[in-house]
C-alpha cells in the first residue's frame, strides 16, 4: 500500500512540474526591464511609425537582450531586439523596397535595430497573423511568432491560415496560452509568453 501511494505521489509531482516547466529556470524581469526602458524614446518613435505598442517593444528588448545593443546570440541574432539579418532583417528590407539584408553594425545601432524590430512586428501583425481579434491573444501570438516563426504557431491550429485564425479567435488569452504550452513544438514558446507578462508587469 505504501509503495502504491509513493508511486502515485511521484506521478502527481511529475505532472505538476511539467505543467510549469516554462517557469524554469527562474527569470527576474526587474533589471532587464530597467535597462530596456532607457531605449523607450526610440521605442516610442518606432512604435508610432509602425503602429506597434512601445511597451511590447520594450518587453521584447528586455527578454531578448536585456537592453544590451551589442548582444549577439549563438544563432547570430543581433542587437537589442535580436534580429537575424538573413530572416527578419531580410523581411524588413523587402517591406522597405530594399535589396539584400542589414549588416551586423546596422543591427547593433539601437535606433536601426528597434525600428527594424517594430517593422517586423508590423509585418507579422498585418501578414500571417492578420485577423486575430482579441488584443491580448494577438500580443501573445506576436511574441511567439517573433521568437519561433508564425508558421510554427499557425500549424498547431491548422495547415490552412484562415482556419487557424478562426480557431485562434475562438480562444481567450488564457486558452491560447494553454494551447501553446501543450501543442507548440518549441518549449520556449510558452516561456516567452510568461516572460512577456513578467516584463509588462514591471513597467
UniProtKB/Swiss-Prot annotation:
Source taxonomy: Bacteria, Pseudomonadati, Pseudomonadota, Gammaproteobacteria, Enterobacterales
Gene Ontology BP annotations: cell wall macromolecule catabolic process; cell wall organization; peptidoglycan metabolic process
Catalytic activity: Endolytic cleavage of the (1->4)-beta-glycosidic linkage between N-acetylmuramic acid (MurNAc) and N-acetylglucosamine (GlcNAc) residues in peptidoglycan with concomitant formation of a 1,6-anhydrobond in the MurNAc residue
Encoding gene, per UniProt annotation: emtA
HAMAP family on file: EmtA
Lipidation (N-palmitoyl cysteine): 16
PROSITE patterns per the UniProt record, alphabetical: PROKAR_LIPOPROTEIN, TRANSGLYCOSYLASE
Transmembrane segments: none
Keyword Lyase listed: yes
Species of provenance: Escherichia fergusonii (strain ATCC 35469 / DSM 13698 / CCUG 18766 / IAM 14443 / JCM 21226 / LMG 7866 / NBRC 102419 / NCTC 12128 / CDC 0568-73)
UniProt keyword Nucleotidyltransferase, yes or no: no
Function of the protein: Murein-degrading enzyme. May play a role in recycling of muropeptides during cell elongation and/or cell division. Preferentially cleaves at a distance of more than two disaccharide units from the ends of the glycan chain.
Principal location listed in the UniProt entry: membrane
The entry's keywords: Cell outer membrane, Cell wall biogenesis/degradation, Lipoprotein, Lyase, Membrane, Palmitate, Signal
Protein name listed in UniProt: Endo-type membrane-bound lytic murein transglycosylase A
EC number in record: 4.2.2.n2
A GO cellular component annotation in the UniProt record: cell outer membrane
PANTHER family: ENDO-TYPE MEMBRANE-BOUND LYTIC MUREIN TRANSGLYCOSYLASE A (PTHR37423:SF4), SOLUBLE LYTIC MUREIN TRANSGLYCOSYLASE-RELATED (PTHR37423)
Family: Belongs to the transglycosylase Slt family.
Amino acid at each position: 500500500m505504501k509503495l502504491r501511494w509513493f508511486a502515485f505521489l511521484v506521478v502527481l509531482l511529475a505532472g505538476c512540474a511539467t505543467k510549469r516547466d516554462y517557469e524554469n529556470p527562474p527569470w527576474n524581469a526587474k533589471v532587464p526591464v530597467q535597462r530596456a526602458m532607457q531605449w523607450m524614446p526610440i521605442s516610442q518613435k518606432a512604435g508610432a511609425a509602425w503602429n506597434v505598442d512601445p511597451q511590447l517593444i520594450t518587453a521584447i528588448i528586455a527578454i531578448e537582450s536585456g537592453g544590451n545593443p551589442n548582444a549577439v546570440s549563438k544563432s547570430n541574432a543581433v542587437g537589442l531586439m535580436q534580429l537575424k539579418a538573413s530572416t527578419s532583417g531580410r523581411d524588413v528590407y523587402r517591406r522597405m523596397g530594399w535589396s539584400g539584408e542589414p549588416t551586423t553594425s546596422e543591427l547593433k545601432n539601437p535606433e536601426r535595430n528597434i525600428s527594424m524590430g517594430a517593422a517586423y512586428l508590423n509585418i507579422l501583425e498585418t501578414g500571417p497573423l492578420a485577423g486575430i481579434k482579441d488584443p491580448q491573444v494577438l500580443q501573445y501570438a506576436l511574441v511567439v511568432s517573433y521568437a519561433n516563426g508564425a508558421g510554427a504557431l499557425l500549424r498547431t491550429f491548422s495547415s490552412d491560415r484562415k482556419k487557424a485564425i478562426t480557431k485562434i479567435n475562438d480562444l481567450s488569452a488564457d486558452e491560447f496560452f494553454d494551447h501553446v504550452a501543450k501543442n507548440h513544438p518549441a518549449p520556449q514558446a510558452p516561456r516567452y509568453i510568461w516572460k512577456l507578462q513578467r516584463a509588462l508587469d514591471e513597467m
